[in-house]
């Protein structure tokens, strides 16, 4: 997949810092599905958060084949506070990502890598939680990544959910001081899997709160909300307050709607539905 859009279209910076701390974020992903939600998340922070502003630069993995883009990526990483990557499974491009990020890993406030090749996953760092030894031990995370590589046909969602089930088992074997960082690592997956602009906004604020040197003027923490989770499968309607996990639940809501007439509530009335991958 080669793109004709320059990475600069994903660059967002605040118009006015207004005395706030500036956090630089760089991300590289396989496909552009997160671009809209991430952009909306950053714009919301810059417009509404009184304590922190975000400058973000984004790259699609294939764009790093271009020497010009790769040089820009290296420069952005060199000044970043937070690095995010997802689905880096192309060997030669994975090596380029590692080459650019590894020299700055220890300096970064946080490095979050969602399922990718082991050498990229080793960049993960959240406080005392690290994946630098991934593949060198028989840990649950190492076993997960091995199975993920062997079962490359499984979906991104399935892989995420497997990891979210595995991590709580890992936590009980960690020293107390590492447990909180491991929990934040797990929360990062939940924010990312949720994928909404609200989840991604709170994901960034969580990282800043826990790992950035940023505080409110009164010394309090940067506020954020827990991730909003969604059903693995469900029925979504744009006017409904939430997703429905089964047909009966959806029909109960549909039949009680005050905004439609009885003709549309007729079980034989035409209805159009779309089957979509989450």
Where are these regions (language model features)?
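An N-terminal assembly and electron-transfer interface module characteristic of large anaerobic redox
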Residues: 1-278
């Amino acid at each position: 997949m080669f793109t004709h859009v320059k990475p600069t279209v994903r660059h967002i910076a605040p118009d006015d810092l207004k005395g706030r701390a500036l956090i630089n974020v760089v991300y590289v992903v396989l496909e552009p599905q997160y671009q809209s939600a991430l952009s909306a998340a950053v714009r919301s922070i810059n417009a509404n958060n009184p304590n922190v502003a975000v400058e973000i630069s984004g790259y699609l993995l294939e764009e790093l084949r271009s020497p010009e883009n790769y040089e820009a990526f290296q420069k952005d990483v060199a000044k970043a506070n937070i690095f995010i990557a997802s689905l880096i499974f192309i060997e030669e491009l994975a090596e380029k990502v590692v080459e650019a990020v590894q020299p700055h890993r220890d300096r970064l406030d946080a490095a979050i890598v969602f399922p990718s090749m082991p050498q990229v996953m080793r960049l993960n760092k959240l406080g005392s939680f690290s994946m630098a030894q991934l593949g060198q031990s028989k840990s649950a995370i190492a076993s997960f990544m091995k199975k993920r590589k062997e079962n490359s046909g499984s979906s991104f969602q399935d892989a995420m959910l497997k990891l979210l089930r595995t991590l709580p088992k890992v936590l009980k074997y960690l020293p107390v001081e590492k447990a909180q960082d491991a929990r934040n690592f797990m929360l990062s997956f939940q924010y990312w899997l949720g994928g909404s602009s609200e989840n991604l906004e709170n994901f960034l604020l969580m990282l800043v709160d826990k790992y950035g040197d940023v505080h409110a003027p009164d010394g309090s923490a940067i506020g954020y909300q827990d991730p909003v989770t969604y059903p693995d499968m469900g029925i979504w309607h744009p006017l409904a307050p939430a997703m429905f996990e089964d047909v009966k639940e959806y029909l109960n809501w549909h039949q009680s709607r005050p905004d439609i007439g009885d003709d549309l509530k007729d079980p034989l009335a035409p209805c159009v539905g779309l089957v979509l991958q989450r």
